[in-house]
Each structure stands twice: as C-alpha cells, then as structure tokens.
C-alpha cells in the first residue's frame, strides 16, 4: 500500500488489474482528455510504462481501491510532465464511470499530494 484515506487505499497497479484498468482506458468518456479511448496496443504500452516508472522513479499512477469492497475503481498518482521546457510533477487520475461523482478522485488526489510532500520531498 502506498497511502490511504478514509474510504480508499492506493497501491501499485499489477497485471491482475489489467482488465479493470483496460476498461477505463478504453472508455471514450473516461479518456476525453486523451483524445479518445486507447487501443489494445496502447493499453499494453500504458501498463509497460507504469511498470517502468515504478522501477525507475518509485512512483506513477496507482490503483485506487475501495476499502469497503477491495474493488479497484480507478487510478491516481504522480506523473512527470513537460511544461514550457520544465519537468513538473502533476497529479493525474482516471476512474471507472460507475464511480464518478462520489468524491473519490478528489480524495485520492489529496492523498497523492500529501504523499508527494511528506514522502518524496
């Protein structure tokens, strides 16, 4: 486990999560900021990138799991982005549409922010 909140815990994504995460990545609505749903090949590449980032950086997007049911409902974590020629850390998230509008994204993002400042700083 990476971090937790009252309702959620965040952990590294594993191959066992592939189908759940692929469902999110292949949902046009969930992927609106990425110009649409991912192909099977893009999903596989996404997973490969996550595993590489865990090994090289020690962080990336993590599985967001409901404590009550142990169900993976999305992914949230820290990513590095290029902004005006500078590398900056951002919090990103993607959730299964069935779990939108319940405050999970905000809750997970706040936990990631705390983790970034308390653990990675």
What are these regions (language model features)?
Residues 1-98, 111, 115, 119:
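GNAT-family acyltransferases
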Residues 101-106:
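Glycine-rich acyl-CoA binding loop
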């Amino acid at each position: 486990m990476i971090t937790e909140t009252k309702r959620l815990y965040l952990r590294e994504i594993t191959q066992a999560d592939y189908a759940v995460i692929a469902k999110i990545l292949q949902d046009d609505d969930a992927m609106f900021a990425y110009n649409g749903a991912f192909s099977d090949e893009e999903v596989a590449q996404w997973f490969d990138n996550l595993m590489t980032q865990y090994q090289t950086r020690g962080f990336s997007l993590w599985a967001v799991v409901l404590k009550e049911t142990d169900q993976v409902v999305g992914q949230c974590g820290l990513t590095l982005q290029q902004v005006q020629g500078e590398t900056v850390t951002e919090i990103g998230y993607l959730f299964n549409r069935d779990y939108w509008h319940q405050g999970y994204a905000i809750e997970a993002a706040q936990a990631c922010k705390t983790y970034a400042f308390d653990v990675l700083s």
